[in-house]
Amino acid sequence: RKDYKNVQFTVKLKNETLRIPRKKVTVKGGTYFLWPFNQSLSGVLLKYSTTQPICSLAEGNNNTYFFFEDDLIPGEYFIDNKDIQDLKVKNGTFRKEKNGYFIDQLTPGKECTIEATKNNGAIVRFVTLTEEESDYIWKGTIKGKEFVVISNSSLIYDNDKITLIDERPSTEAW
């Protein structure tokens, strides 16, 4: 399969045109992906991302959205700055622009986070996992409360507890 060089998409919206990604990339043959754009996530408008969505976790007024960086295509986010009081980024860089925040130079992993504090105090987080970590994400509900676990162990849960099953004497969950 051949690679596709200098790939960039142009999305024309009512009031603006998005170029996704900002810099043209090479897409390896056989690669497939879904990049979200113009999507409201708990009241924060994600204008686009070159990361793939996995799942979300609601914790009271706060919400966390999990994404992963796929097939060596650099992850980037463009988030509307409307209704955002503060933005913090770990393991990446951001700059405020006229229409929002541009986040790039991500180092994917469990600690790669974007935290947007909305004007009402609610927090919306974006976690950018590696492709491998995305294979080990588990989501469920215990006693009416959602949970997300990242572990390469097998996982069983019921209404009371989570059990990790692994041949190793100790295992890790995040």
Regions found by a protein language model. Name each.
Residues 2-174:
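Non-catalytic C-terminal accessory domains or segments of carbohydrate-active enzymes
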